[in-house]
Amino acid sequence: MERFLENAMYTSRWLLAPVYFGLSLGLVALTIKFFQEIVHVLPHIFSVSESELILTLLSLVDMTLVGGLLVMVMFSGYENFVSQLDINEGKEKLSWLGKMDATSLKNKVAASIVAISSIHLLRVFMDAKNVPDNKLMWYVIIHLTFVLSAFVMGYLDRLNKVKH
């Protein structure tokens, strides 16, 4: 009975495979939105203000960071929790594949969230005249919460490594 339960639990990790594949569909959707934004701004490139262009570019950078985060979570999560990726020898391989454990993935995700939040906050500040003060305050508080959380997670991981 014990062996059956252990085998069933171990095999159930494959339930995550479609979830990671679903993230790749999210990446497709993000790519479509990215190019939709470019197609939207290009016809107006000579009439758009500098600040509007910068806001659009920040949106593109934001989407790029989210896309990188999706790729990182997809591949690292799959390798850590489902199965090792079998990539042919002749094919290009990402240098970090197989080297990122759950802790380093967590730290990279936290750092990515801080970067994404920073860009979002910069976009908000560039349009600050149209944003109520209390909303600006909450954006800053939320961003600082992300920064503090990432810092604390990194610090705790360092403490944990020193103890082991």
UniProtKB/Swiss-Prot annotation:
The chain crosses the membrane at residues 15-35, 53-73, 109-126, 136-156. It is found in: Cell membrane. NCBIfam families: HI0507 (TIGR00645). Belongs to the UPF0114 family. Keywords: Cell membrane, Membrane, Transmembrane, Transmembrane helix. GO terms for cellular component: plasma membrane. It comes from Klebsiella pneumoniae (strain 342). It is a multi-pass membrane protein. Its main location: membrane. Pfam families: UPF0114. This is UPF0114 protein KPK_0696. InterPro entries: UPF0114 (IPR005134), UPF0114_bac (IPR020761).
